[in-house]
Amino acid sequence: RRVYIIGLSMGGMATFDLVIRFPETFAAAIPICGSVNPTRLSAAKDVHFRIFHGDADKSVPVEGSREAYKALKAAGADVEYIEFAGCTHNSWNPAFNYPDFMKWLFKQRSH
């Protein structure tokens, strides 16, 4: 199955939440400048993740994405974390322009 979810800011939070609630639905998730309670993420360990965040984000602290990455890694998930130096809350701009953004996404399939 190849169902993908991408969200930014509050949508990034919803991306994490939906994948935790319905992990069997999604092949891949790209939360951008989102956050989540990392203790919930083991439920999503079979979903491919690519997490983006700016290290200067004052709206959604970057620590949320850092902790999500650590929790997913600890659960054995296929996860990549990309942090943009000096980027504020609009990290979706460099994320959507990341060199292989769509190529990576469309390669993902459910386990």
Go through each PLM region and give its residues.
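Primarily recognizes the serine-hydrolase "nucleophile elbow" in alpha/beta-hydrolase
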Residues: 1-45
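Solvent-exposed loop/turn segments at secondary-structure junctions
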Residues: 9-13, 34-38, 55-59, 86-91
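C-terminal catalytic histidine-bearing segment of alpha/beta-hydrolase fold enzymes
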Residues: 48-52, 58, 62-111
